[in-house]
Amino acid sequence: KSAYKPLPMGDGQKMSLRLQGSSYFQTYSLSFSEPWFGGKKPISFSISLSHSKQFLYNYSTRDVTRNQSFNITSLSVGIAKRLTVPDDYFVLSQAVSFQYYDLNNYNTGLFTFGNGASRNLAYTIGLSRNSKAVNPIYPTQGSEFSISGKFTLPYSMFNGIDYENLGNLAEYKMRATADGFAPDGSNYPAGSYLNSEGYPVANPADAAADPAKVDQKKYNWLEYYKVKFKADWYTRIWDKLVLRSLGEFGYMGAYNNDRGLVPFERFYLGGDGLANFALDGREVIQLRGYPNNSLSSTDGGTVYNKFSAELRYPITLNQSASIYALTFLEAGAAFNEFKDYNPFKMQRSAGVGLRVFMPAFGLLGIDFAHGFDAVPGETVKSGWQTHFIIGQQF
């Protein structure tokens, strides 16, 4: 017994530090998770802090402008608890998050304003049920359901700001930032009020509203709510042949119609689902057979739905590597407003693919998908698209 010296083991806590950078962006993040918060029950606690900086980058000339940047600082604290009612498969999760968006002369068309700050303080609550079995890489039966809501405070209910009238106030009117010339050739000094046609006016009431100033005030503190639902079934058809059926829906709304929907946190549908660009907190939704983000407007959608049916068959399920082939049908759509929502108006696709899971690399895959419909704004159907899968499940 005195010679017995087991390897030291922890209690499952995990701490991660990430540093990433290039000539035009930098990211720093730190996270910690505790699976047995309190030490008695399987209550998961997590906290994360991150900061990223994106410099203005010209993809044609590859020039980086370092005095123009978009900085994001994020803090999130969450807790998740396994429930025993109605059964042991349910998990209730809650989180409070805060993001500080700081734009410094970052005029890329992403927002109407290139200078200013937006703050996003939100509470998220979710209920999920996961009974997938037996192999988490290749489930053969069971299901996973989740419903979640994300809510900010309804600031417009108590801050006393008349958002409908902002454009009529002098401080939110269009003003010249430098000496300039009117359309008729006459000149005007910096600071002059301008009307919608570009002419100087003496009375501020006759000047046009400045969208950048109005939106900066509207989105100083983000105000919205989001609701999402997802249902995922796995059914054994024959031997190891498995049918995966998936349906999901998301909606984003506003408390105050005069304040409107925020340009952050929107849904972008189409493509491989890899979030290569998420400065505005967007949610990227996969739909194979179409280019990335092509099924949403440039501003993103506020409501979407997606349905998928996928047949899978394993080639090998060894511990060192799991490989399976698949074929699928998918359909989905994203809409700018709920009044435009039509659950029967969707872009459709079909295809085949291959997945490889190795413990050292995670999940890798490739899909060949054919889009049967045209993307919004075009008349030619999408046709064949190739999608590479890295680390995420469809």
Q: Locations of the language-model features?
A:
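Outer-membrane beta-barrel transmembrane domain signature
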Residues: 332-349
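Metal-dependent nuclease catalytic cores in nucleic-acid-processing enzymes
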Residues: 354-358, 362
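Short, glycine/acidic-rich beta->alpha junctions
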Residues: 24, 71, 223-227, 345-348
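Gram-negative/organellar outer-membrane beta-barrel architecture
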Residues: 1-144, 363-364, 369-394
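Secondary-structure transition into beta-strands, especially the periplasmic turns and strand N-termini
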Residues: 83-90, 235-243, 318-320, 362
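Generic long, charged, amphipathic alpha-helical segments
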Residues: 321-327, 338, 342
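Short glycine-rich, acidic/polar surface loops and turns
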Residues: 312, 349-355
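C-terminal outer-membrane beta-barrel translocator/porin domains of Gram-negative envelope proteins
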Residues: 109-315, 327-328, 335-337, 378, ...
